[in-house]
């Protein structure tokens, strides 16, 4: 079964590196945006297994184009379409915090499951959910940890006084997964969010043993 990686222009550099590591060709997805904001998506090439690469920051703009690309890939003969989204959007809200709110995590999981046969992402924001599979509507979902790559990147340039700092309790598992292999101390702060862009961060004093 032939496989290829397909990428939008905004992720071309990262996608090219990934395609090289996987030993598959990389193809471009072209987007034309009309004056009213609609997007025309055109996929270059085809494959039986299509790996669609796009990080979903700026999700309201990118999600529709990703779904259109998935449809075009299937129309072009793809039997399997796998989404590779290094950043997976709308994962923060896993419960309604106030009456009338949508649970975005569940909605986006079902939406992606309707169009893709599998998903790969990096360190998704899963606070109260045990695994990514639980919200992905039955398709295989792989959450890759960035910790090994980060450990490798910083291991050769560490000061003996280095401390790994996390902003809040939710960050502790990520911080510890990097600090532990390097033998580093960990410091976790407390975060109080006062608005979308206003955050108060308190970091406790630290004394080495």
Features from the language model and the residues they span:
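PRPP-associated nucleotide enzymes
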Residues: 1-209
């Amino acid at each position: 079964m032939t496989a290829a990686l397909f990428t939008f222009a905004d992720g071309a550099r990262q996608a090219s590196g990934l395609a090289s590591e996987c030993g598959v060709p990389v193809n471009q997805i072209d987007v034309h945006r009309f004056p009213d904001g609609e997007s025309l998506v055109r996929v270059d090439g085809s494959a039986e297994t299509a790996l669609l690469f796009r990080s979903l920051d700026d999700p309201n703009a990118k999600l529709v184009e990703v779904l259109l690309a998935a449809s075009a890939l299937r129309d072009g003969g793809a039997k399997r379409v796998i989404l590779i989204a290094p950043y997976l959007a709308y994962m923060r809200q896993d419960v309604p915090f106030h009456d009338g709110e949508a649970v975005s995590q569940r909605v986006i999981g079902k939406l992606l499951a309707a169009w893709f046969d599998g998903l790969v992402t990096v360190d998704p924001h899963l606070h109260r959910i045990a695994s990514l599979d639980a919200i992905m509507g039955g398709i295989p979902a792989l959450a890759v940890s960035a910790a090994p790559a980060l450990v490798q990147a910083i291991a050769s340039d560490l000061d003996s006084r280095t401390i790994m700092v996390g902003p809040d309790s939710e960050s502790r598992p990520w911080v510890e997964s990097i600090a532990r292999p390097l033998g580093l101390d960990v410091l976790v702060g407390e975060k109080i969010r006062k608005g979308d862009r206003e955050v108060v961060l308190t970091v406790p004093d630290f004394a080495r043993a």
